[in-house]
Amino acid sequence: MTHIMFTFSTAFMLGLSGLTFNRTHLLSALLCLEGMMLSLFIALAMWCTQNETMMFSSAPLLLLALSACEAGLGLSLLVATARAHGSDHLQNLNLLQC
């Protein structure tokens, strides 16, 4: 494993640990998800350039488009939650409440 791939896998693991241990605000969870998607995008783009295959050349762009959709949906849920509950605390969000 090269130094650069180790760096991106460490960034992914830090985002994953931040997502599992930081359970107070919805915004911090969304930022951890975005960091994970960014590290996956860069690692996938580097993998495609190292292998020099045309078969997977569109995979990083597809991942980037899906992460942009995820970011837009997450921000809209954040705004809806902040308007409905007054804060973005994850403890206040319970799917069993009306």
Curated annotation (Swiss-Prot):
Keyword Glycosyltransferase on entry: no
E.C. no: 7.1.1.2
Any one Pfam family match given in the protein's UniProt record, by short name: Oxidored_q2
Family under the similarity heading: Belongs to the complex I subunit 4L family.
Keyword terms of this UniProt record: Electron transport, Membrane, Mitochondrion, NAD, Respiratory chain, Translocase, Transmembrane, Transmembrane helix, Transport, Ubiquinone
Known role: Core subunit of the mitochondrial membrane respiratory chain NADH dehydrogenase (Complex I) which catalyzes electron transfer from NADH through the respiratory chain, using ubiquinone as an electron acceptor. Part of the enzyme membrane arm which is embedded in the lipid bilayer and involved in proton translocation.
Top EC class of this enzyme: translocase
InterPro entries documented for this protein: NADH_UbQ_OxRdtase_chain4L/K (IPR001133), NUOK/Mnh_C1-like (IPR039428)
Example of a GO MF term: NADH dehydrogenase (ubiquinone) activity
PANTHER family: NADH-UBIQUINONE OXIDOREDUCTASE CHAIN 4L, NADH-UBIQUINONE OXIDOREDUCTASE SUBUNIT ND4L
Protein name (database record): NADH-ubiquinone oxidoreductase chain 4L
BP GO annotations: ATP synthesis coupled electron transport
Transmembrane segments: 1-21, 26-46, 59-79
